[in-house]
Structure formats: C-alpha cells, structure tokens
C-alpha cells in the first residue's frame, strides 16, 4: 500500500513540477532546472529580429513611439484625440494617427472599477499601441503629425451604429495618406482604412506596414500562474506560432515570414490585439526588439504602383479585446488560439465548450464549475472505483505486509520476494490503483488551464464572499476548506508503515493549501469540489466492499 501511495505522490508531484517548468520555458521565463537556457540576453536597441525573420522590419522606422525624427522645418505639435464607444474609451495620437490608448469599458460593471482594463497605453511606465505607416520612399509614417479630417463628434451616440474618425498626413514624397478608423457598436473589431493619394508627378510603389508595439510587462497574471505574454503569428501553413520575447532578445525567433493569409497578434492573459489584413493579399511578417524593453510584431503589405493623380485603398481590421473564444472564432480563422491552453488544447477546448453550455443553463460560472466537476467525476467513476477497490484490497493485506517487513527487515531481497509472493497469492497488483488515476491527470490539468485562461471568470461572482472567480479568495475560506478536504482524504487511507512517508502524507495538505492561498478562487473551488466528491466516492465504494465481505458470513 505504501509503495503504491508513494508512486502516486511522486507521479503527481513530478507531473506538477514538470508541467510548471515546461510552461515557464514555453512562455519565455527561466527554467527552474536550466536557468541559462531561457535567460534573457541583452540586445541593442533596434536589433534585428532573428532566425526565420530575414524579411523583418529592417526599414520600418523604429524610434520610440511619440518621438519625431529630426527635420529642418519646425516640428508640428501632436495632439491626443479622445473618443468613446459602447465598448471603448480611447485616444488617437495625431503623431502617426496612432491608436495610443484603448480602455475596454465592458470589462467592468461600474461596481468594480478595477475591472476596466486599459489595453493600449503609452505612459512612462508602460507602452502598448497599434500604428501604421508607409515604406519605400520618404513617405508618411508613424512619426509624422496628422491632422483630423472633418472634426466632428468623437463619441458613439445612442442612435449611431458606427463611428468614423479620419486623419490626414502631411504630403511627403508626393504622397498623402488618409487613415480612417471605423468603430462598430458592440464590436471589438476596428476597421482601419488607409487611402494613399499620389499628389506628385511620378508613379509611386509604397509598402504599408501595420504593427503592434509593446513592452514585456505582464498584466493581470495570477501569482504562481504564468500565462503567455508576447507576439504570435497565424498562417494557414504553420497555424499558431508563439514568439517568446526571450527569443527576440537572442535573435532566435522562428516563425513564418511571408504569407497571403492569417494575422499577427500581441497576446497577454485574458486579452489580445491582432492586425488582420485582407485574405489573399501578399504580406511579409516581422517581429523584433526595438528598444531595451520594447518589441513589435507586424506585417508589410506591398501596394501596387499608383500613378500621379490616382489613389489606392488598403483595408484591414484591428482586433483589440477579451479572449472570448466564441467571439474570436467568428472574427478570423484561428484567432481563438490566442486563448492559449498550451499542449492540453485538444482536451481543454471541449471542456470549455461543456462549461459554457452548463453556464448557459445555470447563469453562474461558479455553479457551472461545480456541476462540470461533478459531471467529470461521474464519467470517471468506473476508473475511480477500480482504483479505490485496489486500495481496499491493499488495505486488507497491509497487516500481513507489515509482518513480512518486520520479519525480513534485515534482508531486503527476501522481503521483496515475500511481498511479491503475497501479491501473487492474493491476486493484488500494488500498482493497480495507479493507472486509473494517471489516466485522469490530463483531464484535470486541462480543466485547470480552462479556468485559468478564460476571461469569462474575470469579475464573475459565485456566492456570498466570492465576487470575482479570477481573484484569490479574499478571506481564504476556500483554501482552508481545500486543506481540510485533503487531510480527510489522506486520513481515509491506511497510514504508511514508513515514518518518513507518513510525515510526508500529513505535510502535503498544508503545503498545497499554502500555495492555493494565492490561486484564483475559481481554481480553488474546482479542487475543493473535486476533493469532496473523491471523499464521497471513496467512502461509498469502501463501505460497499465492506458490506459485500460481511454477507457470506
């Protein structure tokens, strides 16, 4: 019995450690075992992007946002144009017509102002913005000061469905650019139309770049729960490719650099932004470090030659919002993958679908978690029953095992041989309870990541003191209940004969509960319910087996 329990705990603990370390490395953070393997290397500002990125930004202007290039004429004064819709409050910087600030209004309910997330921002402590410009000549780019065209209302009124804001560049290289943002009611997708006018006397062949620029500062990441932060690229050829900041630091980023489909994105916990060019239009993809702590990912889209007096229109979409899976699926192919489940995606996606269906009936994410956990335990009941039956059989022969250990304590070889003979005679497999548990581990790990990655948990209440399932329990009631449930579950099993193992089993509930004090309440709720159901199952099966044993007598 003690051998099996030791193996189970070793498997569980090592799985948890390896999972955490793998997640650390895949998200660009130092490994617990080989820190140098993912150590962030210093890089000069404006460094090239790296392997697989030979067509990167190279000639894209790279001064920090808001810094104008030196000119012989006096620099124009940039302004911030504020706007508001039903989902956004934001600011457009007339320097470059850059979307410099974007607050997601629908992420708060007015009662919890801290839930209002500012996605794009450009302050002394944080930079994250979306910008565009032209390459291929001395054409307007994100450093030039634009002027607002037909300045009118900058708020979406009650009877409006769309809000359009247009900005016109100065003439440079015989080219003038008019950039128009279209905001639609209820939508996190922004239309970005770039009209390129050739007001010169010779044909021009510009290239339009669209990029996302941000620092590597994490936002809203729960303690002990690191999620991916950084650029991502999606194409039909390679599908979803995450790019770690650490790989950009070391010029080792590997991703598709040319396509006529897909999108580029910046991903963080719960939220993302993505440039989505028109499908079927050739574009080059780039990602690079442009400052000690500033990175960018973008596309360069060539524009056909424009004759004097003619113009060209380039349309694209900019997504900036929460990682709501169903919404993302309807915006662009593969965009739902920014909600990152890692290597357990194949299991996690169906679990979230089921959780979402349950929520559609009960209307509360906390109760949806409880019911989903109950459903999973019911599905795995046959496996759990097999495990508990094996444990019960081992419990029956534990006194005889202890007697053999005492008898052959000075001869380990004979003791092992005697134990093997006992197992054979009683038809007991000491590892019989392990397999059912191991099979369930991927499912429970997947549910963990579903609850951690789902923005739907953000601000979602359960009952009484739990007002936000994405935050830790403010009074630590759930972690304490989890510690108690773990202790009860441990006490239902026979005490290992080895004193060291016995102490370890008593220590585990305390160790886990301390860690879970800082976990989101939704995750702890799942573990508490899972433990309570496991205790009930084990008690039921053990009692049933005991009743069966007594009947013949």
Curated annotation (Swiss-Prot):
TM helices/strands, residue ranges: 7-24, 365-385, 435-455, 474-494, 509-529
Gene Ontology BP terms: protein insertion into membrane; protein transport
Record InterPro entries: Membr_insert_YidC (IPR019998), Membr_insert_YidC_N (IPR028053), YidC/ALB3/OXA1/COX18 (IPR001708), YidC/Oxa/ALB_C (IPR028055), YidC_ALB_C (IPR047196), YidC_periplasmic_sf (IPR038221)
Membrane topology label: Multi-pass membrane protein
One annotated GO molecular function: membrane insertase activity
UniProt keyword annotation of Secreted present: no
One of the record's GO cellular component terms: plasma membrane
Keyword Oxidoreductase belongs to the record: no
Pfam families: 60KD_IMP, YidC_periplas
UniProt keyword list: Cell inner membrane, Cell membrane, Chaperone, Membrane, Protein transport, Transmembrane, Transmembrane helix, Transport
Superkingdom of source: Bacteria
Chief place where the protein resides: membrane
Entries under CDD domains matching the protein: 5TM_YidC_Alb3 (cd20070), EcYidC-like_peri (cd19961)
Cell compartments where the protein resides: Cell inner membrane
Subunit structure, interactors included: Interacts with the Sec translocase complex via SecD. Specifically interacts with transmembrane segments of nascent integral membrane proteins during membrane integration.
Record-stated family: Belongs to the OXA1/ALB3/YidC family. Type 1 subfamily.
Name the UniProt record assigns to this protein: Membrane protein insertase YidC
Organism: Burkholderia multivorans (strain ATCC 17616 / 249)
